[in-house]
């Protein structure tokens, strides 16, 4: 295409509206909350407001931090644009670099590199600042020989490569999306499909797959290993420590349903 050969895709979120999460003591369960049912298959733990809504996403027992919280949205854009959906390998690093003493378990800063056929996908996420790649708080960039397509929820633009001042293609200034938000459109589509029994634009298969890709980034981070993935078998190759993190580990009496 006009961008030339795509060599790298970047996907990122810089979340400046979330800052340090102060440590809170455990507390009685609020009235009206069935806390045992809320925990579900997760390990038993005293009630703590930090582990409840909204901040449960920063604890490994329930979620995966920004890698899964935002990764399922932005990596989805990236894979769709790449037209490659199954990584061969992934490695990741990161930690609590911005807020080392706060209450979160998941990293406030993380990087992951996914390997595909003749192309790499790079993930970046951090908390407390909002000026990410190309000045955007979130987005996906398809970096080609002639130019870079930058996309986020608000619109898109093309930045031309210009070695020695000679542009390889025509740049495209920011074109704002306009119209309804993507979230509203997804909700409308989902509700419509409940009535028509059609497949939603974001099907359960798509959602499950992109969640798996994001989780692989966290598994690489938590093990400190480069993870190799067999897409046909749906399993980690040659790494039992990593493979254990792909398996359900439910608290009794919960169990993974068998269909």
Language-model regions, residue ranges each:
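Contiguous beta-strand/loop segments that form the cofactor/metal-binding neighborhood of enzyme cores
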Residues: 2-205, 211-259
């Amino acid at each position: 295409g006009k961008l030339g050969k795509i060599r790298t895709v970047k996907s990122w979120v810089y979340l400046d509206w979330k800052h340090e999460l102060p440590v809170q003591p455990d507390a009685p369960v609020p009235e009206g909350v069935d806390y045992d049912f809320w925990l579900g298959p997760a390990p038993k733990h005293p009630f703590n407001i930090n582990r409840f809504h909204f901040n449960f996403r920063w604890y490994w027992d329930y979620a995966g931090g920004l890698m899964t919280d935002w990764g399922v949205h932005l990596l989805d854009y990236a894979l769709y644009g790449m037209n490659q959906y199954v990584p061969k390998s992934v490695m990741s690093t990161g930690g609590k670099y911005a807020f080392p003493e706060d209450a979160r378990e998941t990293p406030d800063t993380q990087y992951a590199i996914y390997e595909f056929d003749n192309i790499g996908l790079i993930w970046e996420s951090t908390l407390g600042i909002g000026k990410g790649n190309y000045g955007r708080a979130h987005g996906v960039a398809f970096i080609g020989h002639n130019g870079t397509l930058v996309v986020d929820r608000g619109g898109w633009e093309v930045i031309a490569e210009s070695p020695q001042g000679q542009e390889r293609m025509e740049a495209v200034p920011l074109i704002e999306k306009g119209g309804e938000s993507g979230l509203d459109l997804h909700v409308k589509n989902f509700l419509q499909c409940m009535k028509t029994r059609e497949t939603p634009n974001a099907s359960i298969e798509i959602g499950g797959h992109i969640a798996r890709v994001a989780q692989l980034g966290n598994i690489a981070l938590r093990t400190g290993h480069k993870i190799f993935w067999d897409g046909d078998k749906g399993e980690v190759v040659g790494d039992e420590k990593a493979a254990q993190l792909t398996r359900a580990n439910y608290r009794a009496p919960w169990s993974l349903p068998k269909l």
